[in-house]
């Protein structure tokens, strides 16, 4: 299915005019949405639990409240807390304070699509999902453009939900560079698949496997790190800028020939079948339930996975090598530390 890119000129209704907006959560996405909307002339308050994020929101000049108080005051409530805590936050502090005609928004469809959160039928449910981390959403807005976004409507109680979604996307700067309409189902399942099979899970597993093959064959770990991890950014940047074509035009003929000959030997039809199994677990809710149940149990699986990952040899080798490369990791100031 082909979708049409939309821009600021396509946002016909200033649906957020006169609305009080509550951004719930002040982390990576929360600070970016809130600051961009404020700079776009919107009336924004913050709802967040006491702690560092609460203090940071006040320091950044926002009227800051508890989640319950912010919900009571607002017409439009955007929930930007981490996926795993949204259900309990919604049930305890947001749901009791919603009114008919309110709009509730999300930047990811996880809790709505898998029905961990059920919003009353007289409340709009929309989505604005920028395709980039919060610090990039903020930085590009300040530079005069933005990050593309997906928007969707799950529930249109007032007849105005799509206008709210599009105007929100405009307010955070996304409509400057392009909007794509989607559904909660499509955004949620595709986003999770991309993260698990390619961008995060697939990529890190591929890098680690390559590192192990080289070191087990007797090659120096430091050299293996450069070959399978450090140079990854250089290749990905070329693909990002101009697709596979630009990457292949930029590498040597030797590398290009090896790409065609050996790539299919690594990513086989069996790997594709494994990817289909990953997608199936996303579609049928197995992954979502496993993730939420692990959180409710105190995160034993996630904690174990993190400990295992931290002890990988490639991580230890990389940490030492990066000390000699002060230019690595200096591209986006310290926004990650501030808002995470």
Curated annotation (Swiss-Prot):
One of its GO terms (cellular component) is cytosol. Residues 183-328 form the KARI C-terminal knotted domain. Mg(2+) 2 binds at residues 191, 227, 231. One of its GO terms (biological process) is isoleucine biosynthetic process. NADP(+) binds at residues 26-29, 49, 53, 83-86, 134. Its cofactor is Mg(2+). It catalyses: (2R)-2,3-dihydroxy-3-methylbutanoate + NADP(+) = (2S)-2-acetolactate + NADPH + H(+); (2R,3R)-2,3-dihydroxy-3-methylpentanoate + NADP(+) = (S)-2-ethyl-2-hydroxy-3-oxobutanoate + NADPH + H(+). GO terms for molecular function: ketol-acid reductoisomerase activity; magnesium ion binding; NADP binding. Pathway: Amino-acid biosynthesis; L-isoleucine biosynthesis; L-isoleucine from 2-oxobutanoate: step 2/4; Amino-acid biosynthesis; L-valine biosynthesis; L-valine from pyruvate: step 2/4. Binds 2 magnesium ions per subunit. Coiled coil: none annotated. It comes from the Bacteria. This is Ketol-acid reductoisomerase (NADP(+)). It comes from Streptococcus pneumoniae serotype 2 (strain D39 / NCTC 7466). The lineage of its organism: Bacteria, Bacillati, Bacillota, Bacilli, Lactobacillales. The gene is ilvC.
